[in-house]
């Protein structure tokens, strides 16, 4: 990826998502990644603060320009399809926790829990329901910290919630499960349409195109929302 960026002078950004150990994070820094999500959100807050602070110092010593993102709160894990999504309202990051975490760790970017969850419910996949975000909490956390905020677990979120979240302070949005659902559905359709076909390059083009269309639609939504927020 670095070679492609240099060869074509294209702004490819290398991010290591959800790295859970100091050793793994240091490997990423030495490899020249632009940013890392150092995720110890499963730990109690005080342990998360202490270990993230130590990791930030170590990573900046290796690569001073590297952006370090920290995570607090519960947004689940894994790109899975669930029968139902748990109620996120009891697991939201508070503005006080966010301020403490940012001030005591020195992170560049914060990923708080604001109503989203990794994965999607079956009803979301069927288009029967949408995920909703706590916009007021996003605004309060942004005001309390002043740092860029990342939304993880964005798949299945209502479009208007994305627009309002970006206006309230979200800078980065992560989406994965939506892409995988599009890939799976299109692959099933392609195989059904050509049951005797065994050549991958004859099966996969519509699959790749279906994922591309989801990416394009999300980029349009986020870019327009960002322009309005400005």
What is each of the regions a protein language model found here?
Residues 1-11, 18-145, 159-175, 181, ...:
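Alpha/beta enzyme core
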Residues 151-153:
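Thr-Gly-centered strand-to-loop micro-motif
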Residues 211-215, 225:
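Acidic, glycine-enriched catalytic cores built around paired aspartates
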């Amino acid at each position: 990826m670095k070679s492609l960026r240099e060869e074509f002078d294209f702004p490819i950004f290398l991010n290591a998502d959800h790295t859970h150990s100091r050793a793994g994070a240091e490997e990423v820094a030495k490899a020249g990644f632009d940013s890392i999500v150092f995720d110890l959100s499963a730990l109690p807050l005080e342990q998360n603060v202490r270990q993230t602070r130590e990791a930030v110092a170590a990573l900046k010593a290796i690569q001073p320009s590297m952006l370090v993102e920290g995570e607090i709160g519960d947004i689940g894990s894994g790109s899975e399809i669930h029968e139902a999504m748990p109620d996120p309202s009891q697991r939201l990051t508070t503005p006080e926790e966010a301020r403490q975490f940012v001030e005591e760790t020195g992170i560049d970017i914060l990923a708080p829990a604001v109503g989203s969850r990794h994965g999607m419910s079956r009803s979301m996949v069927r288009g029967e329901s949408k995920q909703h975000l706590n916009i007021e909490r996003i605004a309060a956390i942004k005001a309390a910290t002043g740092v860029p905020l990342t939304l993880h677990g964005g798949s299945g979120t209502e479009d208007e919630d994305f627009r309002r979240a970006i206006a309230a302070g979200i800078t980065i949005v992560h989406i994965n499960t939506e892409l995988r659902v599009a890939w799976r559905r299109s692959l099933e359709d392609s195989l059904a349409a050509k049951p005797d076909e065994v050549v991958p390059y004859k099966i996969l083009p519509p699959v790749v195109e279906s994922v591309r269309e989801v990416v394009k639609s999300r980029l349009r939504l986020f870019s327009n929302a960002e322009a309005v927020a400005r």
